[in-house]
Regions:
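Buried hydrophobic residues that stabilize the cores of well-folded domains
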Residues: 1-238
Length: 238
């Protein structure tokens, strides 16, 4: 166990990837057999699962990242969708297939828990975990393993209006054994109809950032950033 709990969570997902490495193809076939409905999308290549990214706000905060759009018509023989989504009879998303060859299967081992295993080129390259309570997403974690180890986690806090705070963590281990760690916090506001209207960065008290032991850590944003508000133009209720 490391001194950083976020690093421990990353290592937990890496262990999950190793656990499923010998059987990922078989599990993908089994879950593919449960698909009763498919949806198709364009765009969203830069986002985990594209249109159905588990994070409700990732594309609102990260510039240049879009969810893409669902196609209203089935693709023709001359037209290949960027992403194909498969749903089971419970209307749960169970498979994701990208035109570039990457695939992912999603399963639900217990109530309130969703696990995703992504693979490409004969190896597991992505593991994700979502935890829900009372119908709301509480945490979303994702670890990319294609080049080094890139871990991302979002922790959500709600009030009577909806999403109020987001804690955003990233922890990376590179092939040269260097590491980086960041923790950002955002506060959200809503319109009268309950849709997200704006957000801003707020200070976060992270003891591990204060320690900075052995890490190449991005400095916290200057206080002037905390005075800036960013308008959300997309209508989204969270």
């Amino acid at each position: 166990m490391s001194m950083n709990p976020i690093a421990d969570e990353m290592n937990h997902l890496i262990g999950t990837a190793r656990e499923f490495q010998p059987q990922y193809r078989e599990m993908y076939r089994e879950l593919s057999d449960t698909v009763v409905r498919r949806e198709y999308a364009r765009g969203g290549q830069m986002l985990h699962r594209g249109y159905y990214c588990p994070s409700p706000v990732y594309d609102l905060i990260v510039g240049g990242v879009k969810r893409g759009r669902l196609l209203k018509r089935l693709p023709s023989a001359k037209s290949t969708p960027d992403v194909t989504f498969g749903f089971n009879e419970k209307d749960q998303l169970v498979t994701v297939e990208r035109s570039g060859g990457g695939k992912e299967f999603i399963f639900y081992p217990e109530d309130g828990l969703e696990l995703g295993i992504g693979f490409m080129s004969d190896r597991v390259c992505l593991v994700s975990e979502c935890r829900f309570a009372q119908g709301r997403l509480q945490t979303y974690s994702c670890c990319y393993l294609a080049h080094g180890k890139d871990f991302h986690k979002e922790v959500f806090a709600y009030d009577e209006e909806g999403l109020r705070y987001l804690d955003w963590y990233t922890f990376c281990e590179y092939d040269n054994n260097k590491t980086s760690y960041e923790h950002e916090k955002y506060q959200f506001e809503h319109d009268e109809d309950g849709t997200l209207s704006r957000y801003r960065a707020v200070p976060c008290d992270d003891p591990f950032l204060r320690e900075r032991k052995g890490l190449s850590q991005t400095m916290e944003a200057p206080f002037s950033v905390y005075d800036m508000e960013f308008e959300i133009t997309q209508k989204r209720k969270v």
